[in-house]
């Protein structure tokens, strides 16, 4: 597997900057996506990077989201609907479980309690650290109306600091993404088959097997 990932990273970085802009790497799994993204970044020798905490979606069924035990400490949850004590689209850190309730902490530092059996229309995220450097390609994983960013946007890093990651969108706008809290983004060189649906690209490098690759409808 690692040899296959290295071959794809090599093929991608051998392209001209213009060709890379029009090329999408499609991976079969999140593990493959992580590995290929790291290999591409090493080959590109990006400098001046800083470490940031980002959020990645955790797969959970509707039945699992109704169970308090699903909400492990250090996970982050965002709700798709307003409810008692909770706001739609806000990221809440999981503090712990008390009986049939989950204790969450909002951005204001205040704790709230939620019953998952009643409020299960949600997305779980896990936190992990990545390095981001000027020149990096990132993919936005959650829309932010305030910043003018859309889920799926591919953005190019212009500058990094302890306070923010400044990016340029494909629409040409410059946006400073605050870095004080975990950010909803990931490296954007490789994406999974699921996340690639709806994207268009002039060139596609496929890590996955032919069996799953034929489901792609990109041009």
Please name every model-derived segment.
Residues 1-151, 156-158:
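Conserved helicase motor core of P-loop NTPases
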Residues 103-117, 162-179:
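Short solvent-exposed strand/turn elements
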Residues 116-124, 179-188:
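Structured surface patches comprising rigid loops and adjacent beta-strands/short helices at the edges
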Residues 142, 169, 208:
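Pocket-edge structural micro-motifs
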Residues 183, 207-217:
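Conserved RecA-like helicase motor core of SF1/SF2 enzymes
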Residues 189-197, 214-219:
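Conserved SF2 helicase motif VI
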Residues 199-209:
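A short beta-strand element within the Helicase C-terminal
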């Amino acid at each position: 597997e690692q040899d296959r990932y290295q071959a794809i990273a090599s093929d991608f970085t051998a392209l001209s900057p213009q060709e890379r802009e029009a090329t999408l790497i499609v991976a079969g799994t999140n593990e493959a996506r992580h590995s290929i993204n790291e290999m591409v970044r090493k080959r590109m020798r990006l400098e001046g990077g800083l470490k940031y905490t980002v959020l990645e979606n955790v797969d959970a069924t509707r039945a699992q989201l109704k169970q308090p035990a699903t909400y492990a400490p250090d996970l982050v949850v965002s709700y798709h609907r307003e409810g008692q004590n909770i706001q739609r689209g806000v990221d809440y850190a999981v503090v712990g479980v008390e009986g049939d309730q989950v204790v969450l902490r909002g951005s204001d530092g205040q704790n709230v309690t939620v019953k998952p059996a009643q409020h299960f229309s949600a997305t779980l995220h896990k936190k992990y650290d990545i390095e981001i450097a000027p020149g990096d390609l990132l993919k936005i994983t959650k829309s932010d109306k305030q910043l003018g960013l859309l889920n799926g946007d591919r953005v190019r890093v212009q500058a990094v600091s302890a306070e923010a990651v400044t990016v340029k969108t494909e629409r040409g706008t410059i946006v400073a993404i605050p870095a004080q809290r975990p950010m909803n983004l990931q490296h954007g060189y490789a994406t999974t088959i699921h996340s690639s649906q709806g994207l268009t690209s002039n060139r596609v490098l496929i890590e996955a097997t032919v069996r799953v690759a034929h489901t792609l409808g990109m041009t």
